[in-house]
């Protein structure tokens, strides 16, 4: 049995489900299948868009257990995205109804033959909108590249933000 940390994001409304805040819980429910168990999921947070998109994101994270290897789970995640109306083309930062990413897994690092599958996820250490919900459900999971756990990676963002907001004395 493998454990996976899944990043969940949305910044485009669905014609039936509604706003990104409503899409996230539906996406968590969609992850629960015969061969995938959702152990935990975070609260939904709001984040600013990356790139030129103007829509704010709703983000969350989930821990799932499955016998599936990373490529098979990624294919399943892409199927769920498609079911929600995601079209995979163009820029990675463009608006999307649903984005599901494998962030970490219990098997350590994974570098498959396909460039879209690399574990840990390349953006894991540099994106607070990924780390904040991840820290809610998997604070002690270690990033195999840096050796730091999710809580430590996430706290680096909070510390930097606090420093930036302090008054400047000359």
Task: List the predicted regions and their residue ranges.
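N-terminal beta1-alpha1 ligand-phosphate binding loop
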Residues: 1-36, 42-46
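Small-molecule pocket liners
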Residues: 4, 60, 127-128
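Short beta-strand-to-loop capping motifs
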Residues: 10, 62-66, 106-107
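A general structural signal for well-ordered alpha-helical packing
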Residues: 24, 28, 59, 74-77
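Short amphipathic alpha-helical segments enriched in hydrophobics
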Residues: 31, 35, 39, 81-84, ...
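Short, well-structured hydrophobic secondary-structure segments
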Residues: 32, 63-69, 73
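Short, charge-patterned binding micro-sites
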Residues: 40-66
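Flexible, gly/pro- and Lys/Arg-enriched active-site loops
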Residues: 50-56, 71-74, 79-170
